[in-house]
Amino acid sequence: MNIQIFGKSKCFDTKKAERYFKERRIKYQLIDLGKYGMSLGEYKSVKAAIGGLSKLMDETSKEYEENFVKYLSDETDKEEKLLEHPRMFQTPIVRNGKLATVGYRPEIWKDWV
């Protein structure tokens, strides 16, 4: 099991996800999206597991508004903006190989353990 948590340092749900795995003594890797972002390969894997771009974007984020993403009609343009500005990701994104979740989802994570 190789758990990766992609999150933002000030996100409460990211901290809750960390706590969930710590309490169960499950090793995980924390990746700060604001600092390191997400590689294209990781992004494609997560997008396939989640079921689309719309579930990955945080439409309430300041970056989403500042970059006028809601006015972009082409999904490729939205993806480029998302990878350029990783703070627009909905967090936490928890990944276990080919499986992934967005948000605090302990009901799904317990099946991974």
Language-model-derived ranges and their functions:
Residues L33-V113:
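Thiol/selenol-based redox catalytic cores and closely related redox-interacting motifs
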Residues M1-Y20, Y28-L33:
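Local sequence-structure signature of Cys/Sec-based thiol-disulfide redox active-site neighborhoods
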Residues I26-Q29, K62:
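Short, solvent-exposed secondary-structure junction/capping segments
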Residues Y20-K27, E42, A48:
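N-terminal non-globular leader segments, chiefly Sec-dependent signal peptides
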